[in-house]
């Protein structure tokens, strides 16, 4: 879906170069994949815009990785190479960084267990507290995250320490803001703004993406920080408050509508099973998506009232897109397919809504490239072709295909009568 908000300008509007900001929401590995595919489509199909020359980048959680890369001069295609492709280069962002067990956190919590057990027994036996109340004290022995996120800081620091890049907010050409949430107050922490810009970009990224339950909170200057999406979905006001002419927002997570498209062709479409058939993970995913998207919708209504002189364009997936909703982002094959899917879907959205988008973008010197939009053979990624004379490669390819087909069957099969 592409949503636009119209700016109301006076005749004295500035004729200087338009101020452009880019706000990227979170969404885990899936969010990063979608945003990369969508950005590549925008870069290919919009003339007059350079996504490495924005005035302000705002990133939350996974969107922070993309925002930081763009601010450091990495093009959308280079980000695709780093996040999506599975080539043995030092530029790759390996998803294995995200699934290392948090042994240090677990060990620290286990050390507390004897004392907590003693405290619980004392409260129950000596103080006469109810057993359930006494056992609540054992909650402090549970780890705050199951995966270690320290590797995120180390690897991003390495990538941004290369020549021509910087891990220091203050040395970037454009403004970069990475938003986390302070755990003890619930306040937003806009790393990169004055007073917050001394923190390394890699550490701010680690904090902004520290989703509670998955990753432990990140300690910065003696305070604990967690995922920035806990406070807001986009934090677009960070850029809007500083004044921009055009704000482009990318939101990768939308609630899924398990119903066919309306229209004459709807009767011939295959029945989409209820999400309840996917069990707890699917129900929780839909719940989480619905909550963050409702916040986003309320936020955009507020933006329209409070920032009438700014054009705002929101780009997000179709809510009936089952491929994105049921994706396995830790599968290399599916990462490539999802990035290509996001690329093609974004191009289709631009074609469908060009009458609505064109005049708004033209006010800022941006034009739709009709040739690129109509090019049916244009792709983000070239198909991977394994050598026919490599038995191991062929076997691995067949295994990937079988597993992907099995997963697709399990997530989309209809309920039994």
Model-identified regions with their sequence ranges:
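Patatin-like phospholipase
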Residues: 1-60, 68-417
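Catalytic cores of secreted/periplasmic lytic hydrolases that degrade extracellular macromolecules
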Residues: 63
